[in-house]
Design a protein with these regions (language model features):
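Basic, nucleic-acid-interacting segments
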Residues: 37-184, 191, 245, 287-293, ...
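Short beta-strand
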Residues: 53-55, 194-200, 240-244
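Short, contiguous, pocket-lining structural segments
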Residues: 175, 198-200, 217
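Flexible loop/turn segments at secondary-structure boundaries
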Residues: 20, 59-62, 73, 203-204, ...
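C-terminal accessory nucleic-acid interaction domains of nucleic acid-metabolism proteins
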Residues: 1-25, 29-32, 39-42, 46, ...
Length: 328
């Protein structure tokens, strides 16, 4: 274990030469990426409950997204982690949240040192919900309640929506890009500013900042969008969750806007056979892509993109200037 100083914090890192990807990308390189992207990434994860996907043994060879649509199965040896692990440093922010699974003691990434600490635990993927912790008011023992069916004055609120585009069997990220362009036109017509992001796999997410709203209302908006797209373009979009019906079509996974769900954070790495990153992109890049490789970005690519273009997801950080969620 080697002690390092990060932003005034002292923490230990280990096994820096250990490959975490089949091609040899090491833990040290993962840590370096998260340390260097932190200033750009942290505003998108700060004040949000963090779910981590850890790969302590590294990403197994042959780990790819399935060609069937739907949820990607966990790679052997990987696991999701919600509770703060044993040994969490005292300086790491934590927030207990009452969920259907019980009270979860979430980690919250507030500073670069937290991202470095998580990278040292081989937490390659970082997932966050669309609501923020500080918008709610904790109850007894500091526990925050998730939004339920009935509104309460203490529940946390969503400040963005995500349209998660899930391509069915036989489709790839180019199909997701085409779908994103169509969805963005609808969202812009509703007064929102759509922000596209590649998932680091076959999908694309379209985000938009919103004035604080109840998570069930954000979910209902994206569900309506799902139905509208399937009605307008039934040959390309499908409203059903059925894997069979989704073959060759795009499904808008509106359930990603539920309070209990989370999506891959902007600039998070992905646990795939090759190190890739969930990357904010421009609409011109989506429209002009001719190969899946045009929308696949490595950690080095992303760092270079940020140096050249800055944060392409900056419109998600509008705060009080965000548009109100369209009503039903």
């Amino acid at each position: 274990m080697t002690a390092v100083r990060v932003g005034g914090r002292t923490l230990g890192v280990s096994n820096l030469d250990k490959p975490l990807y089949p091609g040899g990308f090491t833990k040290g390189e993962v840590i370096d990426y998260y340390a260097r992207i932190a200033d750009t990434m942290l505003p998108h994860v700060r004040d949000r409950a963090l779910t981590r996907l850890r790969f302590p043994g590294g990403v197994p060879a042959g780990t790819v997204a399935p060609d069937t649509g739907g949820t990607t199965p966990l790679a052997p040896g990987s696991f999701y982690e919600k509770n703060a692990p044993v040994g969490t440093p005292a300086w790491v922010r934590r927030q207990p949240v009452r969920t259907s699974e019980g009270v979860i003691d979430y980690v919250v990434a507030e500073e670069t040192a937290t991202l470095v600490w998580l990278a040292n635990l081989a937490a390659l993927e970082l997932h966050v919900p669309q609501w923020t912790l500080s918008s709610g008011r904790p109850g007894p023992a500091g526990v925050l309640d998730l939004p339920g069916d009935e509104p309460t004055p203490d529940e946390p609120l969503a400040n963005r929506v995500v349209v998660d585009l899930d391509p069915g069997a036989g489709m790839d990220v180019l199909d997701s890009a085409r779908a994103a362009l169509l969805v963005a036109a609808e969202m812009a017509g509703d007064g929102l500013i759509p922000v596209p992001q590649t998932s680091g796999s076959k999908g694309v997410q379209v985000y938009a900042a919103i004035a604080p709203a109840r998570a069930p209302d954000a979910w209902a908006y994206v569900k309506r969008l799902n139905a509208a797209m399937a009605k307008a373009r039934p040959e390309f979009f499908v409203a059903s969750m059925s894997i069979q019906q989704r073959r060759g079509r795009i499904y808008v996974d509106y359930n990603q806007d539920l309070a209990a769900r989370n999506t891959i954070a902007p600039y998070s790495m992905r646990g795939r056979a090759e190190p890739s990153v969930a990357t904010p992109v421009t609409w011109e890049e989506l429209a002009g892509a001719t190969r899946p490789e045009d929308l696949r970005f490595s950690p080095t690519d992303v760092l270079n993109r940020v140096d050249e273009h800055g944060d392409l997801a900056a419109d998600l950080l509008l705060g009080e200037d965000a548009a109100a969620l369209p009503s039903g």
